[in-house]
Amino acid sequence: MINIAKEHKVNEQIRVRQIRLIGGEGEQIGIIDTRDAMNMAREKGLDLVMVSPQAVPPVCRLLDYGRFRYEQQQNEKENRKRVRSQEVKAIKFRVKIDDHDFKTKTGHVRRFLDDGHKVKVTIMFRGRERTHPELGERILVRVAEALADVGTPEGMPSMMGMDMNMIMAPKQAPAPKKERTEESAEKAGSAGETEPVPAASAAAEAPANV
């Protein structure tokens, strides 16, 4: 795979007389005049893009530059999203928290989990509250139960100073049963083996009608 830089010379921006050309399917065409390569690009409805300007002669490739840029931007967006998902967000609760505040803060945790973030849930103790860690544990249990559909606790709660902490991680959605069944069928077919599925088993695995 050729790594194309963000800034490239495209079509008429390519001023050299000869280039080494790579076709739209990655095939090596060889060293040809740039003018001939431009004509070839026009005939195929593609762009001539310089992918390796330091080579002698420079290497160019035939491709749909607009589509390539779109795919590159989508990949960059996914990479940024992946980096953001590695951030750990933090939401703090008090030991004495009313139902309204609990619901509001739990909603914040839910949004972070939905966005793919881990969340550190912190219970803050004041004064003598620290002598009753079970109060903080109860709140953390409530949080975990309220968010069981979108997240799971990582490890046990831990005390740090006057705070009790628990990390909630996003829950990965399981692959649909239909896809797993099709994948198994493909593997069995490629191996030249087919095994009968008992009727009871097939009925159990079939998704329920809603």
UniProtKB/Swiss-Prot annotation:
Sequence segments annotated as region (Disordered): 169-210
GO molecular function: ribosome binding; translation initiation factor activity
Low complexity: bias regions: 187-210
Assembly and oligomerization: Monomer.
Amino acid composition bias (Basic and acidic residues), ranges on this chain: 176-186
Biological processes annotated in GO: ribosome disassembly
Protein name: Translation initiation factor IF-3
GO cellular component: cytosol; membrane
Keyword Nucleotide-binding tagged: no
Entries under HAMAP family matching the protein: IF_3
UniProt-listed Pfam families: IF3_C, IF3_N
Recorded name of the encoding gene: infC
Main subcellular localisation: cytoplasm
Family the UniProt entry places it in: Belongs to the IF-3 family.
Gene3D superfamilies (UniProt xref): Translation initiation factor 3 (IF-3), C-terminal domain, Translation initiation factor 3 (IF-3), N-terminal domain
Subcellular location: Cytoplasm
InterPro entries to which the protein is assigned, alphabetical: T_IF-3_C_sf, T_IF-3_N_sf, Translation_initiation_fac3_CS, Translation_initiation_fac_3, Translation_initiation_fac_3_C, Translation_initiation_fac_3_N
Domain of life: Bacteria
